[in-house]
Amino acid sequence: RHCKMFNDFYGLTGRPFQLTPDPTFYFESLTHRKALSYLSYGLAQGEGFVVITGEVGAGKSTLVAHLMATIDPARLTAAQIVTSKLDGEELVHVVAQAFGLIVDGHDKASALGAIEAFLHDEARAGRRCLLVVDECQNLDLAALEELRMLSNFQLGSHPLLQCLLLGQPEFRRTLAHHPGLEQLRQRVIASHHLDAMEPSEVGAYVEHRLALVGWQHAMHPGAHLS
């Protein structure tokens, strides 16, 4: 109710700073522009892992939502999962569900078979497959190893699945230093850490989001943003 009164008073048509990622509000700061270039390069390779890390609120999910909005579904089939504390077997079933697959049986082998058959069908139809995995810091080593194994699926010499991994800074550290992740590290073809926005960009960012919900007033040049 208070939010509606606030919006009515200022003539806003929506919530400019809602927490849910919305590609409409994407603002290309310097660090996001760099991340998008790494993403574009990585996805063009069509294989391996692309890694984007950043603090909570850095804009990882909004960046990916912006990217997803530009994807041609006739050429790329994308699925996204937000991970909790999953082990390897649970992860495989979650991936199958994300691609809309019905798995006969509850064992890992059945889920893997369904995923591989699906990836082969998509490849024959001329579509690449992308799996976006959010909150990767929640995954244990067994689950990360399952992701690496999924990325091994091929049709001839053609990789069938590419993975985009999103995580908080602790995932970046784990990926860089854990001895059990050496093979996964070798499969990373592009990575970027989202830094904080430059102080000089904050005003433009606020105005950008306000303008998208109907704000028609100029911000005072001396306005203090904190």
What is each residue range found by the language model?
Residues 100-126:
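Central P-loop NTPase core of STAND/AAA+ ATPases
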Residues 1-46:
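A short, basic N-terminal segment
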Residues 12-17, 75-76, 86-105:
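Conserved NTP-binding/hydrolysis module of P-loop NTPases
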Residues 116-120, 124-165, 170-173:
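Conserved Walker B catalytic segment
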Residues 50, 73-83:
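Conserved catalytic segments around the Walker B and adjacent sensor/switch elements
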Residues 101, 121-126, 130, 155, ...:
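Helix-loop-helix "sensor" segment of P-loop NTPases
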